[in-house]
């Protein structure tokens, strides 16, 4: 257990602050902020406006890689689950032994399969999709790679780059890459359509 703990956690550095975006520890080298996620460094408050952490022996934080590549994607997955449940859908995390991230079941029985991705660079996600397409044999009516909205700030064509890769490498795939905002709109719209169809059947 101690080995696992030491591989996942490290002491909190002196003069650390709570990152207002991801909740990890933000440090400063001069005026330059440092965090595990580059998107956290955009439009940050002044150092004096951040919440300082009082250092004491025994204070721990997740290591950079664990926070960046495990915790942050997990936050996105939980956000997708929350959106689905708010729409009245069932949401199962990590179905089929974590084959993908979220299985959403709509009120009419439709299944949507979601893989949440936090790659800041679309070409990294493109390569990941080409090397490891997770939706092979997945039984679902719709399939999505969902990325945070701020990924499109630096790369407005982010989703197009990934969708072009899907069309080229997996022409029979129904998967598509969308931002969280677009995914939320599509899910809410589909749920409303389901409700309308059910109402029309009863009329």
PLM region spans:
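Nuclease-adjacent, charged terminal/linker segments that flank catalytic cores
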Residues: 1-52
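Non-catalytic C-terminal interaction segments of nucleic acid-processing enzymes
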Residues: 3-4, 160-203
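Hydrophobic, Leu/Ile/Phe/Ala-enriched alpha-helical segments that form helix-helix packing faces
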Residues: 5, 80-88, 162, 166
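Acidic-basic catalytic patches of nuclease active cores, encompassing PD-(D/E)XK
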Residues: 12, 48-96
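Short, flexible loop/turn elements at secondary-structure junctions
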Residues: 23-26, 106, 118-120
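A short, well-structured beta->alpha microelement
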Residues: 91-100, 120, 124-131, 172-186
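Active-site beta-strand-loop-beta-strand hairpin of nuclease catalytic cores
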Residues: 103-113, 122
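Catalytic cores of nucleic-acid endonucleases
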Residues: 116-170
């Amino acid at each position: 257990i101690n080995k696992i703990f030491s591989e996942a956690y490290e002491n909190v550095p002196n003069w650390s602050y709570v990152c207002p975006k991801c909740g990890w520890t933000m440090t400063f080298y001069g005026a330059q902020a440092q965090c595990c996620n580059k998107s956290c460094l955009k439009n940050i408050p002044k150092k004096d406006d951040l919440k300082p952490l009082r250092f004491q022996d025994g204070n721990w934080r997740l290591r950079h890689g664990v926070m960046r590549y495990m915790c942050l994607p997990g936050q996105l997955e939980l956000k997708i689950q929350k959106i689905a449940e708010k729409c009245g859908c069932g949401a199962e995390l990590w179905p089929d032994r974590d084959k993908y991230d979220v299985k959403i079941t709509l009120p009419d029985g439709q299944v949507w399969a979601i893989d949440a991705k936090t790659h800041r660079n679309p070409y990294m996600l493109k390569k990941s999709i080409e090397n490891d397409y997770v939706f092979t044999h997945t039984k679902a009516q719709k399939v999505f790679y969902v990325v945070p909205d701020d990924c499109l700030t630096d790369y407005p064509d982010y989703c197009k780059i990934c969708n072009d890769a899907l069309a080229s490498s997996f022409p029979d795939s129904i998967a598509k890459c969308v931002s969280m905002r677009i995914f939320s709109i599509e899910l809410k719209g589909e749920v409303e359509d389901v409700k309308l169809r059910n109402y029309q059947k009863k009329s």
